[in-house]
């Protein structure tokens, strides 16, 4: 599902809100989440999951085009950990 598909679906389900209002709310929510992660803080949405930053240590990688070794710097990457309710709903699909 893309962001525009999500906006369309939410606007359909929430008839009191226009698609523009839903779009503004989603954009603001995503902006706030990005700002929070940018400061190194964690985001927890109970039942859904949590977003945090994980550190990837420096390592030696490989350029897939040339095959040469490349030194990669350490960096922080966004990480999502699904909550218990979300895991259970997804597991129910698989059974």
UniProtKB/Swiss-Prot annotation:
A GO CC term attached to the entry: cytosol
Annotated GO biological process: DNA recombination; regulation of DNA-templated transcription; regulation of translation
GO molecular-function terms, A-Z: DNA binding; structural constituent of chromatin
InterPro entries xref list: Hist_DNA-bd, Histone-like_DNA-bd_CS, IHF-like_DNA-bd_dom_sf, IHF_beta
SMART domains linked: BHL
Keywords: DNA recombination, DNA-binding, Transcription, Transcription regulation, Translation regulation
CDD domains per UniProt: IHF_B
Entries under HAMAP family matching the protein: IHF_beta
Family: Belongs to the bacterial histone-like protein family.
Subunit structure and binding partners: Heterodimer of an alpha and a beta chain.
Function comment: This protein is one of the two subunits of integration host factor, a specific DNA-binding protein that functions in genetic recombination as well as in transcriptional and translational control.
Protein name: Integration host factor subunit beta
Organism in which the protein naturally occurs: Shewanella pealeana (strain ATCC 700345 / ANG-SQ1)
